[in-house]
Amino acid sequence: STDGTEEIALEYVKKDERFKYVFQENGGVSKARNIGAAQALGTYILPLDADDKLEETYIEKALSHFTHHPETLLVYCQWGFFGEATNHSQVSYKGYAKLLVNNEIFCSSVFRKSDMLRIGGFDEDMHLGLEDWEFYIRLLDEQSIVYQIQEPLFFYRIKAISKNVTAAQNIAEVENYIYQKHIRRYSLYYGSAILPLRRLFLCEKELEDCKARIARHKNKWYRRLFYKYIKGNLKKK
């Protein structure tokens, strides 16, 4: 990193001996998470990317649920966005079959370190995204108990970066990698139709996102002015 991350991290290490700074050459998200988990001394793991945020009660509430419901395999919460968007997501886990089609759990969930090690951690061959989705496909199964805290306690930063053809190609490549890696699981639930089903799901999701964006601007003054201008020009013609 060239943004002074090391200096900032070392300052926190000096302030609190519970912090540990571990340096590694950039090897991707999966490798960083695996190395961090290997160094962790606690029972539970919560991955957190540098540009995302947690409410201070998230960990407390997650661990409380594990304590009272030890059969739970994974805990997460509702989540919101900040940066270029400030809305909240209404997505929730609807079972393992739906998870195979689309990831409904964000990256900063809470799970046991022993379970992470049991399945071999995150896939370090993945460098183009969706690492957390592939991880959950291996971590969970049809019988797994997943609990969602009904509060937005995690916030994901939305950056002002437009999607492009290369990004779409990367996602398609990763989807195919995940499908080929877990072809037996997919065949059990969907046969060979999973990739077309996911394409359809993503199209529907994009449509719903567009509807939501339109609704947020429906009664804005500039929208009314725009339509007034358009109608005026049409009448002139």
Regions found by a protein language model. Name each.
Residues S1-E7, D49:
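A conserved acidic beta->alpha catalytic loop
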Residues E6-L10, G42, E55-T67:
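Short alpha-helix within the catalytic core of nucleotide-sugar-dependent glycosyltransferases
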Residues Q24-A40:
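Glycine-rich, basic loop-to-helix element that forms the pyrophosphate-binding segment
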Residues I45:
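Short aromatic/hydrophobic "clamp" motif used to bind/position activated sugar donors
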Residues D52-K53, W79, M126:
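Acidic metal-phosphate-binding loop of nucleotide-sugar-dependent transferases
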Residues T57-H88:
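Conserved donor NDP-sugar-binding/catalytic core segment of glycosyltransferases
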Residues G95-Y177:
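Conserved nucleotide-sugar donor-binding catalytic segment
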Residues N170-K237:
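Boundary detector for helix-to-coil junctions that initiate low-complexity/charged tails
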